[in-house]
Amino acid sequence: MHANTTQQVFQELSFNGQWRRYQQRVLDSCKTYMADGHIHLVAAPGSGKTTLGIEFIKQFGQPTLVLAPTVTIRQQWVDRITTAFLANPLHAEQLISQDLKNPKLITIATYQALHSAMIQLKGESRAEDTDDQAEIEHFDYQGFDVVATFKEHALGTLCLDECHHLRNEWWKSLEAFRNSFTSIHMISLTATPPYDDDPALWKRYITMCGQIDEEITVPELVKENSLCPHQDYVYFSFPTQEEKKQLKAIDIQKENVLHDISSDNLFIEKIQDCAALTGRISIDELLEEPKFLSATLIFLHSKGCSYPKNFQQLLAVKKLPPLDLEWFEILLQGALFTVPHWYDFTKDEVKQIKHQLRSAGLIERKQVKLCRNKERDLLLTQSLGKLKAVQEIFSSEYQSLGANLRQLILTDYIRKDFEPRLGDENAKLTQLGTLSFFESIRRETVKQQIPVALAVLTGSLVIIPTAARHRLEDLLDADRLKFLPVGCLNPNDYLKVYLFGDQHDLVGAVTQLFQEGFIQVVIGTKSLLGEGWDAPCINSLVLASFVGSFMLSNQMRGRAIRVMPNNPDKTSNIWHLISVNISKNTADNPFESSSTWANTRFNGDSPDMELLNRRMQQFLGLSYTENVIESGIERFNFGFITFTKENLTRLNEQTLLRSRLRRNLKEGWREALPIYDNMEVVQEIKIDNKIIPHVKFWDTQKLLLLTLATMASNIIFYIFQSIRSRSGQVPINIASFLLIVLGLLWLRYFLYRSPYKRLKILGKSIQKALLNKNFIQTQQTDVQVIQHDKHAISTEVFLKGGTNREKAVFTNAVLEFFAPIENQRYILKARHKVSDQTSYFAVPNLFSKNKSDAQEFANCISNKLRNYELIYTRSEEGRRILLDARIKALSNKQDRTSTKKRVISPLK
């Protein structure tokens, strides 16, 4: 395509909205960023990332390939260009292609499609994170040269949307394609940059995308009224009686299998006489995987069997813990898969044990799963107890908002097989899905006589209130619509809708009904997000989805926190469902008697809780306990409670009450957001005070010796003077001088012994090392420490200033410095014997590539802190020292560090 023609076509792309202030800030600087041919934007959901990406494409003004992670997101790009940038939507077909074989000025495809084209694949693929309307891409790229095609098309710009969420083989194809175009312009867009990835993966990401140019955060968007004040709420549910029976049956089967294995005399003898305990495995190798040695001793101890006590001394533990599922899982994992040569089981014996475990579903992909297994997790994540939870959330939200409620419930599956039973009060709800949630809430509205209009909105099934029919016919040509009864529902209440033609029109029209209040609750699937769908009216979102990536969770959450122009007081609640099993059996630990085990407790980890924990690592939100904005599950403040059914039920009641105080929520955000410009998100690292190294006192010691020498000479002088004057008294100024000097020395010692001061000095030492090697390039950064009272057991440190990546680099370096010694390449060893937990520290990975880097890091640390020598652990002497360091680390296995994000003012 000729350059002039290309420019003329691009002139037709013109944003028909008004740029927000932070968007305009990015656009004002984009020419500068584009000077090197790259622009890399990190932007929270709701910031208009896709819209900015389209504007960047226009600015570069060259044929462009946009790559998206899924088919649904690919469609979002098409919809956004059509609705927001084209005066005549009919021109979209001339401008946009979704087919790699037939590129146009803007070609939009998935990463998977590009990978398939690069390897010339023929076939189809079902995408992950989808519902009944599976995202299936059909490929026939045999004999197709995608690189040659786009070179002929004069490809000038490559736009990558969330490119780090890729499988390794897709990455390789993307890199090969990118490297085929030496002078191509790059646009990179993401809401979740891989800050915490391995340095090699981060380098790969930055090599592809370029350094991050701009970042737009959620708090910034709330501050500028581009996103509404919002809060995440956690609601606990419990399995039904039938599910409890199934869970109990799983536990009993597991208990029987484990009893048979652990009580087998041959099994016990093999463990007792294993190679690990009879000198056939080196001490060095045993300490490579100390958990397997620990599990072996714990098992034998629980059986009352003898074992060489020197191995317990090697682990530096005086008392072994009782055998439980976790330790037995570790033992079986080691014996069957990880270190089978430590044990003496024959092939037939291993085969028999594996068969026993598989029969109870306790092995998955060469991993022994006693604490958690797929069957049990599936029962919990898909527990029908969540139906009741959503009912209660709906009732509470309606009580709070009444006719103003606009609730969206997103789930994974439609469950069309239940459609004929909709409206049948006696029909049993047996699966979670769009239709079961619809029916559950519908029954609740009938029971409470609540006049709430519900709707089902998915790619293949739409149900609306009959009262909204005429308005829908106003929005769409009535001749294109077909209304049918659905299931056993009264046609006067609900109708199923078909549309002849483009289904996007129906989705848009039903969304308009939602906006106007003809519908108050929409139940849909995640695929709805890919329909170019947006509904700013949403003020209550229930994430009833248990399948999905963080990226998709981010998208779902972003739908609820958009502002509504005609409702400036809008706030939004986001609900997360957690199914937990509270049991009265001993299946958690079949190795203990019921008399010594709690009668009612949280039975095992919840997969929902694990998912929530992952989600909250990146989501910044308002803390429950104070008006601060931070990430992490700790902000919900339920870590202090015992997980009993009574406690969790009470917590649910408190959560519902809190969720109804929407005015307080808005006020909380107002107080939490700094009133200053240029707010900053920092990554706080909490560190146990016991492991913070001590400050070096060489300068103090020198000062003390010099002072004592001076004092001694002065005393001698005054004694002679006294003798000569026959006064018989040492002048009082000697004593005063002595007290002042000793007081100053004691004050210096007192100040430098505080964890706050020590951590500040350590942080600055690590910062200096990172600056010296250009891992941090922003000079205007500062290490800050949060000071607590003297009874605090931990202290927080963070890097203020710099880019988010530089903050992540600092955070990772601090975490790696304090990490338990395992098999690090370089470690630091205190030159003088110490009695606390500060004998050994690890050299962070960034400095472990070679000795000179490691030595430079060690010099920065030893310059201000207690003297440490650098140890190379791959030498013979180094291995001996590493062994000692591991032993000390094993005796201190509790969590030493943790991290979270927090928003601070630049004045703090």
Residue ranges and their predicted role:
Residues 51-55, 59-85, 110-113, 170, ...:
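Conserved Walker A/P-loop ATP-binding site and its immediately adjacent core
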Residues 44-47, 90-95, 100-107, 144, ...:
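Conserved C-terminal RecA-like helicase domain
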Residues 167-227:
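Post-DEXD/H (motif II) to motif III coupling segment of the RecA-like Helicase ATP-binding lobe
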Residues 113, 123-187:
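SF2 helicase catalytic motif II
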Residues 115, 427, 440-449, 456-627:
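Conserved RecA-like P-loop NTPase helicase motor core
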Residues 2-42:
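Conserved pre-motif I regulatory segment
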